[in-house]
Amino acid sequence: MTNTLQFKEFSSFVNISFWHELSNKKLDELKLSEESIPLNGHYTFSPSQQLDPFLCLEFNAFLRNNVTNSTENQYVLPPRSYLSHGTLYNYNTVDDFKQSPKIKLFNDASKRIWNDINNGNIDKDTSLLNRFILLTYADIKNHQFYYMFGIPALLPSQPIQQFTEKPESINIESLKSFSNQILPQYFCLKQQQQESSTTTTTSFELIGSIEEKGNQYLNECLENDLIPLVGFCDPCSLPLNPGWPLRNFLIYLSIKYPMLKKIKVLCYRGNGSTSNSILLSLELPSMGEQLIKKQQEEDAGEWSGKSVGWEKDSNGKIAPRFVSLASTMDPLKLAEQSVDLNLKLMRWRVMPSLELEKIKTTSCLLLGSGTLGCNVARSLMSWGVRNITFVDSSKVSYSNPVRQSLFTFADCSPKAKEKSIAAADALKKIFPAINANAHVFSIPMPGHSVPQSEYQSIRNTIELLENLIKQHDVIYLLTDSRESRWLPTMLSRAHGKLCINAALGFDSYLVIRHGIKDQCQNELNPSISSKLGYQGSDLGCYFCNDVIAPTDTLKDRTLDQMCTVTRPGLSMMASSIAVELLISTIHHPYGGRAKGETETDVYVQGSTPLGIIPHQLRGFISHYQTLPLFSNPYKHCTACSDYIIDEYNSKGFDFIINVMNDSSCLTKICGIDDLKNTEVNIDWDIDISDDDDDNNNNNNKEKNDDF
């Protein structure tokens, strides 16, 4: 009596980590590519009758097998698991996914199995019998995925029959020899019977894997007219049916050994407290017809056999499946991935060379948390900057929230919050993963004298400011007075930090990138330096056009001078330009030491993928005009000249205290006073040597007054 053998198909089990890995790979590597990608899946034998046979994909499914280079990561199977070779086809749109050539792709996978059987690859690696294809569409913006699994099983010319009524159950004692062994995927074994006076016991012993011992063992059985006994690790738990991996294995045996008519198969399902392993007695169909068909395929170049294996949905239909991870993901991780999404999409087509990691790891110190500080912080976050520190000494007032984008009415009522703290808190509410810090202190300023009793407090403030500048990559000067920018300008120059200054007028703005003192200039080849335009240290600072020292401009101000009186849209323009200037600078090989460019022709290629890197930009909203300008550093600058830096390095705190109490010492130290005296003497000499009229003398007096 015979009955047709039926097999239990695989169900897919895709770990959430796989979808995360696919999203990252799509964003960072695949982009718009729809090329096929090799995958690794695995299954395990089933020790439980309650579990379906699962084909599993984990986070490491994209790693390679048989890696010889030690620097590459290799796919490692979980314990007691077996390999299945897959191919991923990921599509860019849901329509492409729906219209994909599913039948052709499935037949291609079937043909690979068939070819591996006939060209001898299976003799070396039986895991090639287990292949699958995965078709996907990844909606990474909404964290939704559509997918279809195909796990091909070749169909024989006739159904495979059992020559027993039902499979034979295996006693747990018979499998004791397997308890401490790691079994191969497919293997051959022998069955031994031991008789006693009362009972007959059966045991199974492993001979070896099909790759190592299969050919010798099966040929010996054919020569001696014996029924071979082979086995495989079965992921199925049904008492009457084997799992899917047996199908192609039987096809392989039928083709490899055409004289083999009967065979016994142990479906090994683990060695737990009880055994649900079964022993099948099978009749193999002749595969002669398929061998003839194979020759026809080689002539035609197409696969013409039949195969089955599409995974069905919950309704038993061959249809795409759908999974949404939005509800299962950590909201913080979800936000972080979504924040990076638009930035990474820029690299797909528009700008593949975008250095997002450099941007992400750049730390920014924002001195000033008002109108400019709030808008700069928002723009930095939009570019993916993760480390922002605010410094400010004032509190949020009722007039601030409408102009300063990080504040709300709650920040000034019922009790006003410190601006820097409120700004940092606002960033964390917008994006919890950001590293936003705040410090509350007033920056020491030239001409703002302090009593000796406050010297220690001022010293602590200066040390804190200097440490913050050392700890950050970029310093933004966004304060509301000119003199408050002097100390950060000087410290940034002294410590070689990129400093970007943004300042507002009523209908104009200035964004300037300060030059960085080149400490390694002597090590560069002068010819190379000249050729590449290595002029980063030849950029003036905010104070380089001054011939007077910064002094107290806050005293005796009227109300309209104390408040920020500018056209409201101006701060957003200046802030965005200040941030874009930083991003362009990051992409230059020399970073902050890049030369200043003034090219305005949009058809001329800039020095970075993002375009030119200007030294300064002056905008005039009255004429809707922005001008890229360049100015050399002033040798006698009151903030960035070597005279000032050397004085600070030698005297430190005492120098700053002197400047605070009497800012005129700056013009003396940097040499401006000497220049003035020289100019006066030159004019005086000219007046004596030239017998000019009184009109000339009056002109000279006006020139002197300009200083």
UniProtKB/Swiss-Prot annotation:
| Translocase found in the keyword field | no
Instruction: Extract the signal peptide range.
Output: none
Q: What Pfam families is this protein classified in? A: ATG7_N, ThiF
Primary site of residence: cytoplasm
**Can you quote a single GO CC term?**
cytoplasm
Knockout consequences = Impaired survival when exposed to pathogenic bacteria S.typhimurium associated with the accumulation of S.typhimuriumin in large vacuoles which fail to undergo autophagy.
UniProt-annotated catalytic positions:
C563 (glycyl thioester intermediate)
Give the residue ranges of motif GXGXXG motif. 368-373
Keywords attached to this entry: Autophagy, Cytoplasm, Protein transport, Transport, Ubl conjugation pathway
User: Which Gene Ontology biological process is one annotated for this entry?
Assistant: cellular response to nitrogen starvation
Molecular function terms from GO: Atg12 activating enzyme activity; Atg8 activating enzyme activity; ubiquitin-like protein transferase activity
**Annotated region described as Disordered, given as residue ranges:** 686-707
Q: Which CDD domains match?
A: Apg7
Q: Which SUPFAM superfamilies match?
A: Activating enzymes of the ubiquitin-like proteins
Q: Where in the cell is it found?
A: Cytoplasm; Preautophagosomal structure
InterPro entries documented for this protein: Atg7, Atg7_N, Atg7_N_1, Atg7_N_2, ThiF/MoeB/HesA, ThiF_NAD_FAD-bd, Ubiquitin-activating_enz
Q: Where is the composition biased (Acidic residues)?
A: 686-695
According to the lineage, what is the superkingdom?
Answer: Eukaryota
- General function of this protein: E1-like activating enzyme involved in the 2 ubiquitin-like systems required for autophagy. Activates atg12 for its conjugation with atg5 and atg8 for its conjugation with phosphatidylethanolamine. Both systems are needed for the atg8 association to autophagosomes membranes. Required for normal survival when exposed to pathogenic bacteria S.typhimurium by promoting autophagic degradation of intracellular S.typhimurium.
Member of which family? Belongs to the ATG7 family.
| PANTHER family hit by this protein | UBIQUITIN-ACTIVATING ENZYME E1, UBIQUITIN-LIKE MODIFIER-ACTIVATING ENZYME ATG7
Tell me the subunit arrangement. Answer: Homodimer. Interacts with atg8 through a thioester bond between Cys-563 and the C-terminal 'Gly-120' of atg8 and with ATG12 through a thioester bond between Cys-563 and the C-terminal 'Gly-124' of atg12.
Its UniProt domain note says: The GxGxxG motif is important for the function, possibly through binding with ATP.
Q: What is this protein called?
A: Ubiquitin-like modifier-activating enzyme atg7
From what organism does this protein derive? Dictyostelium discoideum
Organism lineage string: Eukaryota, Amoebozoa, Evosea, Eumycetozoa, Dictyostelia
